[in-house]
Amino acid sequence: MNAIESIEVALDTLPENRSYSIHIGQGLLSRMDLLLPHLPGKKAAIVTNTTIAPLYLEKLRSALAEHHVETFAITLPDGERYKHWETLNLIFDALLEHRCERRTPLIALGGGVIGDLTGFAAATYLRGVPFIQIPTTLLAQVDSSVGGKTGINHPLGKNMIGAFYQPQLVLTDSATLTTLPDRELRAGIAEIIKYGLIYDADFFDWLEQHMNSLLARDPAAVNYAIRRSCEIKAEIVSLDERESGLRALLNLGHTFGHAIENAMGYGAWLHGEAVAAGTLMAADLSRRLQRITSQEVDRIRYLFENTGLPVKGPRISPERYLESMQLDKKVKEGAIRFILLDSIGKASPGDTVPTPLLLETLSACVADA
């Protein structure tokens, strides 16, 4: 039996204990001993998409059927551009059609979009039903499946409508990454690099040394990167579940990145690609504020380049960037706040910056026409 590594997300504050486990390993889709304790009845809804369903849906359903768990599938279109109200209503339609009750768990089988949609549906259907994450993309495994952020996009901004709603379990089968396209693998690595930048300089060093192994999908390297990323996120979420302070660090590069996604149209840039370019913008801004050195910016740029990720944003007008960033969830009293680096391995939350410096960064960090 393959080894399993487990991480606890500690959320044991009153009035209820909402702590849960993240299990990481190869072949976990077949490990019903991990999943069944979180299925209170003999019925479950599996939410997935048209890409993942042919690969893993029947494997999961068959394993559950062997234990007399009745399932039905809700198969949604694939892509960030479908993360909206109309798709969410498809989930509600199916839940109502199948007479799902408050004890009927929703299982998210897919990437970040499926996890966000399923989690938001679980948070709101009958005012809350059980929710389990089975992430199948690297980005979802290291980031979006952990921490309880759920929601949908609005034409004016990304993730503007949603809820904090924690899963009961995260089951991460790293074997699903064998079918992940290279572009999506690289996008997930962008979020892994983020963890080293904001919280763990040694992890950043490790990534510099082992990036080729990650890109080659070496199982030991992949499992370590997933585990360390989840450890960092679990620690941060346990200390600040609702992003009142420390958790904001996880948004390094996201203020710029969300502006890129919104301006270019959801799906044109993968989330991790936008975060990569946005992180270089945040690093450039940090250097202009004399928080980090040019040498540190060069190290960051080289690691993203070595991963095959964009290090410059698309050529959008500064006005368009600023307009999109004004809708960022960290805006306070009309002022855009940025997560900035103090060094590799340390970041600071919620800083405003002088507009002239911001414009300099936007000018320097976009691709040539």
From Swiss-Prot:
Similarity comment: Belongs to the sugar phosphate cyclases superfamily. Dehydroquinate synthase family.
Reaction(s) catalysed (UniProt annotation): 7-phospho-2-dehydro-3-deoxy-D-arabino-heptonate = 3-dehydroquinate + phosphate
UniProt GO molecular function: 3-dehydroquinate synthase activity; metal ion binding; nucleotide binding
Taxonomic source organism: Nitrosomonas europaea (strain ATCC 19718 / CIP 103999 / KCTC 2705 / NBRC 14298)
SUPFAM superfamilies: Dehydroquinate synthase-like
Subcellular location: Cytoplasm
The EC number(s) this enzyme carries: 4.2.3.4
A cellular component annotation (GO) from this entry: cytoplasm
Binding site for Zn(2+): 191, 254, 271
Class in the EC hierarchy, top level: lyase
Name of the protein: 3-dehydroquinate synthase
Keywords: Amino-acid biosynthesis, Aromatic amino acid biosynthesis, Cobalt, Cytoplasm, Lyase, Metal-binding, NAD, Nucleotide-binding, Zinc
Taxonomic lineage of the native organism: Bacteria, Pseudomonadati, Pseudomonadota, Betaproteobacteria, Nitrosomonadales
Predominant subcellular localization, coarse grouping: cytoplasm
